[in-house]
Amino acid sequence: MQELQEKKNQSVGMLTQTYRPSPDALLNPLADPTFKTLFTDASPEAHNALTCFLTDIIGKEVSDVELQPNELSGEAVTDKQSEFDINCKIDGKVVNIEVQGMNNDDHYGKRVEYHVAHIYNHYVFKGMNWLEAPQAFQISVLNFIFDEAENDCINYYMLRNQNGRRIAGMLNVIFMELPKIISLPNDYSLLTPNQMWGKFFLYASNSEKQDFVNELAKHNRGIQMAVTVLNNISQDEINWYRETRYWMSVSDKKSMISSAEDRGIKKGLEQGLQQGLEQGIQQAVIENAKILLADGKYTASEISKLLHIPIESFSVSE
């Protein structure tokens, strides 16, 4: 009975407590749950925003966007499963969209290659005419730099040979690296449509950048729709609860990584000191062996057995 009452109190508390920092605060599209809701909300504006975003990022006009389940199982129980932020179909294409804030263990490239192959495998079924096979796209909005050596902020990857000729263009990966977009001018006339989206993701929730965001919205219909959706979903307390929980989990993960790194550094220092001590002792043993050998009372073989070190470590053959 007491347990039921506690759960009831927690539910009431969640509904009555506000997580919104101020009455006009906006959700952050870079938070996983907000990004998903922004493009999958049951409103025509969200659908139009997603359609326009795909058109701008792929570089071709798209229509008839159809949302798909965002979880794909493997063919075998041992296969990795895929869970996407957004999964959708458009004419002749299947698209997975992700927003990613951290490159855990520098393995994001491997994860993405698996995802795009998994999508393609899922939608190409037995007996399908290869002419009907859909192109697969994996689009990632990255809040970290994936490739330091690449200057472009939006990069397109596909299977090509050493001369740049592609095979069939069926597996496609697109990375939008937001840290590279920050340095671009905050002038809509100097930005491409997909760069405008990058600026929107970066500044949509920033109260000091709202004039610029509204300027982007005037010149990009998709961003105009996204601004409308963001304003609407920011009125819903449950969305603030989800975003708050998300940022808490991000902070916890960063703290765990930082703590693990600190422990690793400390352990490394301890191991280094121990290794240095051992090396010092070993060097002293070698010096003693050389003295004994020079004294002539013992043979090199006898010294080696006595001090448990190889002959070559203290005796130079002439």
Segments predicted by a language model, with ranges:
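Non-catalytic, well-ordered alpha-helical scaffold segments
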Residues: 32-33, 48-51, 110, 136, ...
